[in-house]
């Protein structure tokens, strides 16, 4: 009887421990970007965002390397016609810590990014939080956000290294009263005004711009260009 009670106690403890760990693990979404996980991700295909985007999203420009990295490509299908790449989550996510290991593309007139987004196409207001690399100078990173379509919160940070030369970890902690951006675990910028609140998709893309030379520089048509991503992690509150 004593042995049975002891066994029951140990079993109950083990179950409780497993349950606790599982509950904790359930708040964390981490994915190595080594293959196309169709249950979690989707590829943009066959359309253009228009506006400042001077390219068409193509699923064929979203690929995976032999060493297990997501590779987004910017290519040319014909003279002055460009194809770009976007990879995005099928689910939406809210407040929490968003992290990515990535290596942006380097060239004037282009953007490599990691961000959250939702908008009218999803039946919501336009809320967005950005980590963007302007290819004209990959020794810097730009942070920004939109709340109900209102942006203008750009903050450009000098990194002290060329981001296009290797993988680094970039992150933002999104909370009801603030957004904090990090580079390799070091806090770089904090915003507290008019913080977005609508859950959105996790997105990564590479594209070339038009009509925004003062921001991106003039795109010279160079291609193919590639941005690479190693892993993505989301930790909810």
Curated annotation (Swiss-Prot):
Keywords linked to the UniProt accession: Disulfide bond, Glycosidase, Hydrolase, Signal
Lineage top rank: taxon: Bacteria
Positions of the catalytic residues: 128, 132
Ranges where the GH16 domain occurs: 28-237
GO biological process, one term: carbohydrate metabolic process
Enzyme class: hydrolase
InterPro entries for the chain: Beta-glucanase/XTH, Beta_glucanase, ConA-like_dom_sf, GH16, GH16_AS
PANTHER family: XYLOGLUCAN ENDOTRANSGLUCOSYLASE/HYDROLASE PROTEIN 8-RELATED
Protein name: Beta-glucanase
Native source organism of the sequence: Paenibacillus macerans (Bacillus macerans)
